[in-house]
Amino acid sequence: VTTRALRESTQINGVREYIYGDRISRIHWNATAKTGIWKSKEFERESLPKTVVMLDRCRTHYRGAAHFELAVSVAASLLEYGQRQQLAMGLLSVGKEAVYLEPGKLSSHYRRMQHHLIGAEADGSHPIQRVLQERVRHFDPGCFFVIVSPLADERMYQALRWIQLRQTNPCLVAVDAGLDRQAAGEWQRRLRARGIVFYAVDRLEQLPDALGGGAR
């Protein structure tokens, strides 16, 4: 989730179908009169691209249970943040079983994603890029794709570039990747040169600062 996806605005960005419960002040009277169908004003935040959070569940990528639990906590925190911001977010989680929940905003949808994370295990064996290749048809062009993973190496770089070349906006949240300061700096520069957003999170407490842009 990048700051580009979190801007709040009251500026009208377009017109959408009327949804039961919309306030009268939201009705777009001109569009309704022209089409004969109820229309509502769409604001900038509502029209922002959808976001998919991918949790890396490959067993060999983690040093142990605590390492994976940190990744799960980061993914859960990202979803909580998205819910507070009223963003349309989805979840991709592939281990022994594959789960893909399309981006949505309903509270029930967020509860379903969080419920999945509670029982998620690091029981996968497929490389990141293979997981993406098998599911790329589900991702809308222009969507934000956030990978939560401990990988910060050539395999991850190629996966991020592969996503980017398919008209999505990749972001990596590297969870306790074990990079020293020099290696982390080189990794950041390499991704930044490609326009890829990168956050390094070694502890869950660092995530709020990262979301605020301080770790990019």
Q: Predicted segments — roles?
A:
Residues 40, 101-104, 157-159, 183:
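Short, well-ordered secondary-structure micro-motifs
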Residues 41, 64, 105-110, 203:
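Intrinsic-disorder/low-complexity, polar/charged segments
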Residues 70-73, 112, 186:
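Generic recognition of stable, solvent-exposed alpha-helical segments in well-folded globular domains
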